[in-house]
Amino acid sequence: MTTGRNNRVMMEGVGARVIRGPDWKWGKQDGGEGHVGTVRSFESPEEVVVVWDNGTAANYRCSGAYDVRILDSAPTGIKHDGTMCDTCRQQPIIGIRWKCAECTNYDLCTTCYHGDKHHLRHRFYRITTPGSERVLLESRRKSKKITARGIFAGGRVVRGVDWQWEDQDGGNGRRGKVTEIQDWSAASPHSAAYVLWDNGAKNLYRVGFEGMSDLKCVQDAKGGTFYRDHCPVLGEQNGNRNPGGLQIGDLVNIDLDLEIVQSLQHGHGGWTDGMFETLTTTGTVCGIDEDHDIVVQYPSGNRWTFNPAVLTKANVVRSGEVAAGAEGGSSQFMVGDLVQICYDIDRIKLLQRGHGEWAEAMLPTLGKVGRVQQIYSDSDLKVEVCGTSWTYNPAAVTKVAPAGSAVTNASGERLSQLLKKLFETQESGDINEELVKAAANGDLAKVEDILKRPDVDVNGQCAGHTAMQAASQNGHVDVLKLLLKHSVDLEAEDKDGDRAVHHASFGDEGSVIEVLHRGGADLNARNKRRQTPLHIAVNKGHLQVVKTLLDFGCHPSLQDSEGDTPLHDAISKKRDDMLSVLLEAGADVTITNNNGFNALHHAALRGNPSAMRVLLSKLPRPWIVDEKKDDGYTALHLAALNNHVEVAELLVHQGNANLDVQNVNQQTALHLAVERQHTQIVRLLVRAEAKLDVQDKDGDTPLHEALRHHTLSQLRQLQDMQDVSKVEPWEPSKNTLIMGLGTQGAEKKSAASIACFLAANGADLTIRNKKGQSPLDLCPDPSLCKALAKCHKEKTSGQVGSRSPSLNSNNETLEECMVCSDMKRDTLFGPCGHIATCSLCSPRVKKCLICKEQVQSRTKIEECVVCSDKKAAVLFQPCGHMCACENCASLMKKCVQCRAVVERRTPFVLCCGGKGMEDATDDEDLTGGSNSMAGGSQDLLQPNNLALSWSSGNIPALQRDKDNTNVNADVQKLQQQLQDIKEQTMCPVCLDRLKNMIFMCGHGTCQLCGDRMSECPICRKAIERRILLY
């Protein structure tokens, strides 16, 4: 058994932020002096696992030698109730408490202590945990300070060992910047870091909470300074000790003269005549008060308080019980020694305080003989006795002389009896352990033999598990059936609350679950985490067990302690097969977890398109797709916010999600996509005809958001285009920024391109927010304002939809030079194949204005080399030459310039950024290819293919059809909701009267039908009791 002391250290240490300790000998594993890490777990009382901020994880010593110190234990949640930091007013103090030794009732938290608050000359007590020994420290003025380095504000990070947040960071290896150290929860301060990723996403991640490390530092930052030698050593125990080394349970004598004792007692409890008994009697330390005075209890039952200087620690081993021939052996224990446990229960309870503590389960060991397994650094003994291991105060045991010692006949007989008693105890004391082990190994014969013994407990435990649980997890059906014949408790729980059916689920034993079900086991039983066997089966990926549980009627939608149903877990584990099975069994998609996410929300948040596809295909009610969280977010909001494009497409096209639902801030999914500059989501929503002029709580439309972002990022955009912007402000007709929306690279996102796209699709430029600002008021760039106005005008006048893709198009936009606007485009850029400028402006352009690719070659477009009548107007691929007009190019199978086979012909208008009839990449604009960007960017101005055939006269008719469709959908939704209400409230038998009688199985009918029935019409269980509803 692990000692109470070690259990406490291990429990309280997980999550602590640590630095290298006094016995460090591991080089720069931690990154160097002052670098910080997190306690992840304890391998044993002697070893701790630390994950350093640089990503290194290793075991370190925390007993005997101490490799780490505790810098901040606040993330562990240790709190000192009734205290308050007198500087920052934190109440209660969480982490280490620093109490001024020179001021009355003045405390500091760790941050304020190392931050040099209060007088630096004053000495402080360090109190690591509530009730622990306070340690007096030197004044900070004389102490050395070191700078902490690691995951702090300003540091650069990537995902760490405990990362479980999908691709929020943009993908494995992507970097982000820590902006602030925050609290993951109110009970765990300084346990998280807020990170702004390079892809623009930002969120909070665990750095210490429950020992988790979501991040790894690639460029550390400074986290302030600290007093290294004032930080406690992890694992070093000084609780319940005084400066003299006395502990609770120690035996003490008084060896001083009466006059000296009386003098030392002044101010330490004084002296009375009743204390004379203490001069000749050995007492036991039973307490240490706040002034470090020692409370001693004597055999008479009296307790006296002493100055520690008065007392002398007595010898803990009573050598009188061991023969004199065992010289030297009686004063010291060794591993392997035989020892007898004290008989006196009252005495051993007192002695065990601070030495592993007393447990009622230790009662059978009194007076028994055991063997020393381990000796701890504080001299406590780990003794194996009666088939179990416990930690004892050395004063609570008596050493049995070794077999070879010179003993008297009497003592030799006594030793022989004790050894015989030892072996008898091992045989009888291990019977439950033997039963559990035999059941775990599937040894049917041995289990049967053990069960015949009268002293066996069929529900007895070994290592916290019963024989039934062991057999269930290992799939031993024959053993299970035998145990069931002996009235085993099917619902017995282990320390985690798991029952036999939980163990069967964990071990992937479907046949065991069948046996347990027939035996009457509760398949919906929950453990301490509120998990059912179905939760465990889903999390472990045991599909057959999931099917078995559902076949036997296991409830498919029970929630665990975090509110997650098996559906949530299946989505998290990306198990679409289990998802389908659960939905077919009637799992409720609408149940929300503790964070307010139902299954659809969860799939959208996780960015799991396959799960979303399954959910949408099996939705019992179509409107569930628009269910809101408590903050008003729908699944579409979450997909738009996190840039999960595939999920959003499924919600829009397969789920027919309402595009204009508003959250509590009155934001639509389009607001969120524009705010995060997720161009693909913006395009998807606009093409699906989302309303462009919905206002949020501040009155802002998506266009307001886009232009606000443009203003903030304008300097960076100008820097990207510095080679062009020096010539002349760009004209709206050039569509330069509109082309940028077709580019999917993270560096190419442009709020201005989104703004132009919204305007080109009819966004209102005059609508004002609550501050009285129109979108144009938020745009200080007159050129962009002009572009927006022209895009909007083209939309309203029908020009957007009527652009001809013909090579003979008179569209001046595609013919004008994008730099000077005076000359026509006549220069082919290589290698991208775009035509953007005239020959005079082309030398100034370093990057293609359409795709932003580096320009490596410039070729002026000449006459057709075949007919010499027209200009060359078709780009041959893959050679990249433009040497023939449209008519001549259609006849060629090889390029006349290089004789390469022509695999593809790209029209002039497509090279200019327009849309051509021969563009084979019309649906590939999402992939980000150069041609697809050029072809798709013009398509951005067309919400859907109907735009080509619309005229100004028939738009209202189409709008009316759309409105009628929406009304019909709303009516259908209301009708179905009404039908659901009827099904829930009407009697399922007669279908005429309201349901007002409920049976014990949970089903119900009307009273008239219920009174005539003996079994439930739904589940066919016998009706034991009827309850009327009022």
Curated annotation (Swiss-Prot):
Pfam families linked: Ank, Ank_2, MIB_HERC2, SH3_15, zf-C3HC4_3, ZZ
GO BP, one annotated term: ventral spinal cord interneuron differentiation
The UniProt record lists the keyword Cytoplasm: yes
One term under GO cellular component: cytoplasm
Segments annotated as ANK repeats: 430-460, 463-492, 496-525, 529-558, 562-591, 595-627, 631-661, 665-694, 698-727
InterPro entries in the record: Ankyrin_rpt (IPR002110), Ankyrin_rpt-contain_sf (IPR036770), MIB1/2_ZZ (IPR042056), Mib_Herc2 (IPR010606), Mib_Herc2_sf (IPR037252), SH3_15 (IPR040847), Znf_RING (IPR001841), Znf_RING/FYVE/PHD (IPR013083)
Recorded coiled-coil stretches: 957-986
Binding site for Zn(2+) 1: C85, C88, C109, C112
This protein's record includes keyword ATP-binding: no
Zinc finger residue extent: ZZ-type: 80-132
Localization of this protein: Cytoplasm, Cytoskeleton, Microtubule organizing center, Centrosome, Centriolar satellite; Cytoplasm; Cell membrane
Class of the enzyme per the UniProt entry, highest EC level: transferase
Zinc finger (RING-type) boundaries: 817-852, 864-899, 987-1020
Catalytic activity: S-ubiquitinyl-[E2 ubiquitin-conjugating enzyme]-L-cysteine + [acceptor protein]-L-lysine = [E2 ubiquitin-conjugating enzyme]-L-cysteine + N(6)-ubiquitinyl-[acceptor protein]-L-lysine
Protein EC: 2.3.2.27
Domain notes: The N-terminal domain (1-440) mediates the interaction with Delta receptors. The ANK repeats are involved in Delta receptor internalization.
Protein name according to UniProt: E3 ubiquitin-protein ligase mib1
